[in-house]
């Protein structure tokens, strides 16, 4: 299980290493990614999800989760999009996901509040070409 990150800069640096070395990322049947863990998963190609239970929809397995972020008592959407945190995240997702990266980042901001969680559906994944193979 890879959950949220304590340091977004290090997390994005690590993600860019995964991306630059053309590494595959895999969520195993007993694994999951959430928040910063999902950011790392995004850096791989291909991005493979091995479902915990193949009889369930992927969101019911709770293996790939996203949410917004906050800084102190301010939510991400309370910061202007010119803010360094937004620019860094948008640049990261554009780099590792291409043309759908910024739209995916915006999706995470709207998916659930920073204290909440949204487990990605197949429709979510398909819209952003996020999970490249589901097993």
Cite the ranges covered by each PLM segment:
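Surface-exposed patches in mature extracellular/periplasmic domains of secreted proteins
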Residues: 2, 27-30, 50-55, 59, ...
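Short, composition-biased local secondary-structure segments
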Residues: 3-10, 90-94
């Amino acid at each position: 299980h890879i959950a949220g990150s304590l340091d977004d800069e290090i997390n994005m640096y690590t993600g860019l290493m995964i991306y630059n070395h053309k590494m595959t990322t895999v969520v195993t049947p007993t694994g999951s990614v959430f928040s910063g863990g999902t950011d790392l998963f995004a850096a791989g190609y291909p991005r493979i999800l091995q479902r915990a239970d193949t009889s369930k929809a992927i969101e019911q397995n709770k293996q790939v989760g996203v949410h917004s972020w906050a800084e102190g008592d301010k939510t991400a959407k309370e910061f202007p999009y010119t803010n360094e945190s937004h620019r860094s995240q948008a640049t990261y997702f554009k780099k590792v996901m291409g043309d759908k990266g910024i739209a995916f980042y915006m999706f995470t901001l709207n998916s659930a509040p920073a204290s909440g969680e949204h487990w990605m559906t197949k429709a979510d994944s398909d819209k952003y070409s996020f999970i490249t193979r589901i097993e």
